[in-house]
Amino acid sequence: MEDSIIRIAPYHYIHVLDQNTNVARIENGPKTYIRQDNERVLFPPERMVTIPPRHYCVVANPVVRDREGMPVCDGFGQARLRHGDREVRLSQDPFPLYPGEELGQVATALQVVKTNSALHLQAQLDFEDHGEKRVAGDEWLFEGPGTYIPRTEVVMICWINAIVIRHNQGLRLRARKDTRDRDGRDRVTGEEWMVRRVGAYLPGVYEEVLDVVNAFILTEKRALHLRALQTVKDMRDRVRRTGEEWLVTLAEAEAYVPGVEEEVVGQVEVTTLGTRQYCVVLDPVGADGKPQLGQKLVVKGEKSFFLQPGEHLEAGIQDTYVLSEEEGLVLRAVEAFEEKDEAGKVHCRKPGDRWMIRGPVEYVPPVTVEVLSYRHAIPLDQNEGIYVRDLKSGKVRAVIGESYMLSQDEELWEKTLPPNVEALLTPDKDPVLNRNVHQSEAGHQEEGVKKRDPTRVVTFRVPHNAAVQVYDYSQKSARVVFGPELVMLETDEQLTVLSLSGGRPKRPGVIRSLCLLLGPDFFTDVIVIETADHARLQLQLAYNWHFEVKDRSDPMESAKVFSVLDFVGDACKAIASRIRGAVASVQFDDFHKNSSRILRAAVFGLDPELRVRERLLFPQNSLCVTSVDVHSVEPVDQRTRDALQRSVQLAIEITTKSQEAAARQEAARLEQEAKGRLERQRILDQAESERARRELLLLEADSTAVESRGAARAEAESRAEASRIEGEGSVLQAKLKAQALDIETEAELERLTKARERELKYIAEQNRLEVEKTRQLSELESRRFQEMVQAIGADTIRAIAESGPELQVKLLQGLGLNSTLITDGSTPVNLFSAAKGMLGVPAMSMEHRGSE
């Protein structure tokens, strides 16, 4: 700064460097400093450091002060500094920075530590704090409430806020270093503990918060399963070893916060047994709290309990066996024991013994008894039955027509049947209606059919006029049952399956059936024959048949019908052989003319009188064929078939042409008759039309006259009405125009009135705003001048006013003048009274004496 005169305001300072000694000093305001030639001002006047209340700042390289607080100077007159050190200064009067001092931290508000909070501090240097010695590296807490005064030897690590521990909560802590907790207990490094005290907890300096643990709410239906991580005492002061497990229930605590030495395995739900329920607990816990491995305990309802650690249910919650009179249980002893029955008799049961209890009774099996099966009486009609096998002897028998309950030494036996028999025994298959269903079609129908119960006695309803053969393998005999009848198979009996030929021509094994229909019925076959002139023909024939059983009570006679299993195929082959032999000796023309007679003679044969017999009987199975029906005769050779077809077509054409000629003649006759009737009707219609036209002309003339009279009258009336309406309209129009003019005039007057009122209001409001604006501007100007004067200060204004004359006086003193008068041409000087003024006589007193 090159100015010679430097004005230092109050609370400002400058640093002046003496260039001769190279020593800097400080000059504080308020003062006017005149710089010497050998001095240099290092910077313009700068405001002193001001620290507001409850603030602080940090000064680097502070000056050394004596006991009285004054700066210590060295031999050169320069302030001595503590280089590299820092000093914290609190609220005080504004102070300057001495040469070499630096403001390390500007004024900063002191940190207010509230209640339930603290500052984590660490010592950087060794020092003493209120008689307590701190070593570098020490850590401690400054707890609130209070205001923390910082020190240069201490660094703040972080804020620590208290953690609120609510009801049913706990705070899990761990020691970072050997320390003493809030309760005065010594903790080693790494030790963990739990704080359950409700309220705010401020962790210590060496305490680390791991987690806030919520309590487990215990109810009557929920318990807590715990495991000890180390030897510890539980809430009942019972010592728990490492790995030991136990339960905490509602009877011990409503809410439980597990400790650090305890691990929560899970929550256990209550096991509730109804009045008719029970359960078997495996490995139950004894009175000493230890599990009894390998043992069982039966718990009966009504009861609620928790499964202890290590316990589990054998088969869950089971229902008590409530047996009626028709029910029972098959039991087996798993170990030796004694029991009493209802009569008081003692029974010694050995392992493996089987017995059965019957109702009515409510039974809960003990741990020494195993329930093998549940038995109930099987209701059977007189046509129903079951197969029962004795477990001791192995015999199987059928029980039919009575309700039966299996004993402890019996079981249901399943009778297996061949798959084809099972398919034919389905309830929805009727032997009569499905007699023409082939085996491939039957296979598709079997899908989705409910399977037969193999323990039930096999039954088959034989339809009317049918027979079934039952074979007994144990007796090696067969019996035939004629319908209508119900067949019930014994344990060693099987049904005979018939495999019949089917299709056209017949193929073996197409139709399967359990019953043999006795007829009458028919079957159809297709055979190929050859005449004497080598014409090959294909015949489709149908045969009516039935079985002739004279005495159904005779076993030999009844068994004959089953002697030939495929009676259809055998009969068709025999009849086809007869027909081919008979036709081979006949010409085609003869066969074409007499086919029916030739075929009947070939099938039934001739009697001694050369007459055709009435039937054909097969003696081996009593099959009787009664008639032959020729469905079609077709040549096998293509040329023969074409020639026959042409002849048939020619005959058809001749017949058709004759019918067409007759139809044309009849159509021509009918056409002539229709034309005559049409012409006659046309003449009659013309006469009727002329008569109607004459009547129409008469009516038109009358209508024209009436129309003329009506038009004239209507025109006159309309003109009169129009004149009347026009006059009324003119009057109404004049009235409306007058009303419109009045409304328009009133509206214009009202508009002008409102416009003048609005204009007057606008001018008044504008004048008011102008006055208000002028008043506010004057107030602002006066307030600005007042605040400016207050800001500058009276002393400053006086100094500004006196600075000019004082400077002039000093200038005159420098020139050696005792007094002087400086004026300009615009200010006159009274020289007459100047001498009196120099003598110090007031002008007014001199004038007063002169007047006297």
Curated annotation (Swiss-Prot):
UniProt-listed CDD domains: MVP_shoulder
Keyword Manganese: no
Annotated MVP repeat ranges: 2-54, 55-109, 110-161, 162-214, 215-269, 270-320, 321-377, 378-457, 458-520
InterPro entries: Band_7/SPFH_dom_sf, MVP, MVP_rep_dom, MVP_rep_sf, MVP_shoulder, Vault_2, Vault_2_sf, Vault_3
GO CC terms, sorted: cytoplasm; nucleus; ribonucleoprotein complex
Keyword Ribonucleoprotein: yes
Location(s) in or outside the cell: Cytoplasm; Nucleus
Domain of life: Eukaryota
Tissue: Expression is highest in brain and enriched in the electric lobe. Closely associated with synaptic vesicles in the nerve terminals of the electric organ.
Keyword entries, A-Z: Cytoplasm, Nucleus, Repeat, Ribonucleoprotein
Record text on subunit structure and interactions: The vault ribonucleoprotein particle is a huge (400 A x 670 A) cage structure of 12.9 MDa. It consists of a dimer of half-vaults, with each half-vault comprising 39 identical major vault protein (MVP) chains, PARP4 and one or more vault RNAs (vRNAs).
Protein's job: Required for normal vault structure. Vaults are multi-subunit structures that may act as scaffolds for proteins involved in signal transduction. Vaults may also play a role in nucleo-cytoplasmic transport.
Name the UniProt record assigns to this protein: Major vault protein
Organism in which the protein naturally occurs: Diplobatis ommata (Ocellated electric ray)
Gene that produces this protein: MVP
